[in-house]
């Protein structure tokens, strides 16, 4: 009887991908990124191990949402002090810290445990078109999040 194959940390083949977020829909882009971070696109996927790849997201400042979400979608954070709840809209946060929008969307789609925190560290988000990871030789990954558009 053969044993079931289990990948190990040493056999894990981690690749680096670059994703351009320009004119992409936020939620659809985040689901694809979360799948790559978890490694669900690989035949060696194991639920309790980090078998995923690294993802670099560029042009985070140009990600879009549909409808009135720009004015209506709220991002909340709390300082921990009484009355310390801060709320801001998608448009305001996109002007201030555009990286945080994609980070928050992807983080919510990862497991809420130690593995999820480890997977989240494999995500690198940059507001502009430049990134400092050229030494890793990342592959360009085209993700099409606009329904009906040609890739």
Curated annotation (Swiss-Prot):
Keywords: Ribonucleoprotein, Ribosomal protein. The keyword RNA-binding does not apply. One of its GO terms (biological process) is negative regulation of translation. GO terms for cellular component: cytosolic large ribosomal subunit. It comes from the Bacteria. Belongs to the universal ribosomal protein uL13 family. This protein is one of the early assembly proteins of the 50S ribosomal subunit, although it is not seen to bind rRNA by itself. It is important during the early stages of 50S assembly. This is Large ribosomal subunit protein uL13.
């Amino acid at each position: 009887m053969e044993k079931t194959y289990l990948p190990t940390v040493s056999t894990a083949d981690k690749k680096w991908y670059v994703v351009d977020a320009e004119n992409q829909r936020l939620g659809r882009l985040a689901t694809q990124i979360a799948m790559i971070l978890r490694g669900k696109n690989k035949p060696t996927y194991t639920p309790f191990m980090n078998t995923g790849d690294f993802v670099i997201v560029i042009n985070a400042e140009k990600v879009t949402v549909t409808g009135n979400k720009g004015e209506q979608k709220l991002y909340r954070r709390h300082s921990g002090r009484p009355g310390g709840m801060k709320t801001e809209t998608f448009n305001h946060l996109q002007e201030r810290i555009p990286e945080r929008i994609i980070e928050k969307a992807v983080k919510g789609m990862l497991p809420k445990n130690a593995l999820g925190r480890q997977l989240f560290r494999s995500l690198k988000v940059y507001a502009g078109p430049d990134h400092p990871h050229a030494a890793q030789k990342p592959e360009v990954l085209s993700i099409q999040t606009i329904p009906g558009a040609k890739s």
